[in-house]
């Protein structure tokens, strides 16, 4: 998709930052997006792939990501199968939500933070079971192999061969990056922040990562994915609410400084290059 609003009309570059036009800001500010778990680490500058500026552009709706159809389809089909697998293995009853039915947000009382966790534990009455000391679920799918991607309009897209299969760059290369030298899985700070925000908003502290390592064919034929035939690691985590509140406060200040004003974070050199790639300079 790329930029969907008009440069020099809806927004402009002023003093090394993008400023929304007064007309666009007043007309659209009520529709600006909240900070979700996915965006949380990005606005804090923790993502190596997306700057806080790009996240800002998405949140004020002048830019839309161009999603990789192969990855999106695989995720939509495979993640429910992983959730079922986790329920079977743990005996928990993790529930997922229809995004449209909850209007893409379970935290409507918070004006800054929102989103939907991958799974929440329910009791036998269908009520949230956090009082039973059960964790929240976060699902991550990752390729075993390092695959070849190409940057198109500032977004990475998986490259397929003539048979429609992902092209392997290095066998087990992606999987190896998840482990330290002692063979222990390392959860990135970005992913920790993602589930951490939802735990914080629910006022609970236990989470459970389900990390599934996919093979190339899983991206092409996700309907045939069988969780029992893939390596899926379950990693429990905890957050410290007092420590995590420092990050929440930083993100809230970021929201107030940039979303509520219609003025972006200052542009970095990589942001300027990204704008040029999208025809804005």
UniProtKB/Swiss-Prot annotation:
<dbReference type="InterPro" id="IPR011604">
    <property type="entry name" value="PDDEXK-like_dom_sf"/>
</dbReference>
<dbReference type="InterPro" id="IPR011335">
    <property type="entry name" value="Restrct_endonuc-II-like"/>
</dbReference>
<protein>
    <recommendedName>
        <fullName>Uncharacterized protein MG373</fullName>
    </recommendedName>
</protein>
<dbReference type="Pfam" id="PF09588">
    <property type="entry name" value="YqaJ"/>
</dbReference>
<dbReference type="InterPro" id="IPR019080">
    <property type="entry name" value="YqaJ_viral_recombinase"/>
</dbReference>
């Amino acid at each position: 998709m790329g930029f969907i609003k008009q440069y020099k009309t809806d927004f402009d570059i002023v003093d090394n930052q993008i400023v929304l036009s007064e007309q666009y800001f007043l007309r659209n500010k009520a529709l600006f997006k909240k900070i979700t778990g996915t965006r949380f680490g990005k606005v804090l500058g923790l993502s190596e792939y997306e700057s806080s500026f790009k996240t800002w552009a998405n949140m004020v709706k002048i830019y839309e990501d161009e999603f990789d159809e192969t990855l999106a389809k695989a995720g939509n089909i495979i993640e429910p199968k992983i959730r079922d697998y986790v329920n079977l293995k743990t005996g928990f009853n993790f529930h997922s939500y229809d995004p449209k039915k909850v209007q893409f947000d379970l935290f409507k009382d918070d004006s800054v933070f929102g989103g939907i966790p991958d799974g929440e534990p329910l009791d036998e009455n269908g009520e949230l079971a956090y009082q039973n000391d059960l964790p929240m679920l976060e699902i991550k799918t990752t390729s075993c192999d390092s695959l070849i991607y190409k940057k198109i309009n500032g977004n990475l897209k998986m490259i397929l061969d003539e048979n429609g299969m992902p092209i392997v760059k290095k066998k087990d290369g992606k999987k190896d990056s998840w482990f330290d030298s002692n063979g222990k899985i390392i959860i990135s700070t970005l992913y920790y922040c993602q589930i951490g925000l939802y735990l914080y908003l629910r006022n609970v502290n236990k989470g459970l990562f389900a990390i599934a390592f996919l093979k190339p064919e899983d991206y092409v034929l996700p309907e045939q994915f069988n969780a029992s035939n893939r390596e899926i690691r379950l990693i429990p985590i905890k957050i410290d609410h007092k420590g995590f509140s420092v990050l929440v406060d930083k993100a809230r200040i970021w929201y107030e400084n940039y979303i509520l004003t219609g003025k972006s974070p200052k542009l970095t050199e990589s942001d300027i290059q990204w704008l040029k790639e999208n025809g804005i300079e």
